[in-house]
């Protein structure tokens, strides 16, 4: 990789360091088939973008509970959705951060596929090999089918995560996506099995770290190669091997980038400890107000 190009990337203020390494450099170096960036959350100032959108739609959202007639309610929801999507176009897709991500994707010879998760949350998948697109698009299409099925006939027994992300409980889908994203086979299989059994993967991974620390074991951060990745166990040899290989290649590219990645790996382990708390905070926004008042 051209040193001047790398220096420019590292100085880019509109792309977060984690995105530079995990989402751009790893696919560019052929170390990951596909990477994923959630926007605007993984943009510098992403939270502020979301707040600006929310502020614009808040007056309309506040009126929704007062609309009781079914046809009027449906129309009000559609208007709200349109407002959210227009807000995303203006504040996210019109931002320097968005333009910088796509500019760097092009400059590094990478390709991308953008997928809407919610009106104000999109995922950008980044890859080098053109042949990957077919598998990726097929997976995203299957995800849409699973979500439409759940939304068309909601099951009152489903929890918040099952309703919002039904694909997370479809083992075959998880395994296909996990392999595309470069996760070790053993960790993908454990994740899929846990989800199918109703095990809270985030809590399981956090508890594994806590129990290891209680038992006097030293935590091996090298088992956590990526953010929001949950290894099958805290000392997983396969995920540790991934970190060792990736860090070696990044150090060969530039010692500073290798050191940056080392810091990220340590932060990944800490984020696993916090993940159950973060998910609960996210899901709480979907709770009916009367449930919140009881807590």
What feature does the model see in each segment?
Residues 1-165, 176, 183-295:
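A conserved ligand/cofactor-binding region detector
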Residues 171-178:
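An amphipathic, hydrophobic-aromatic interaction surface with interspersed Lys/Arg
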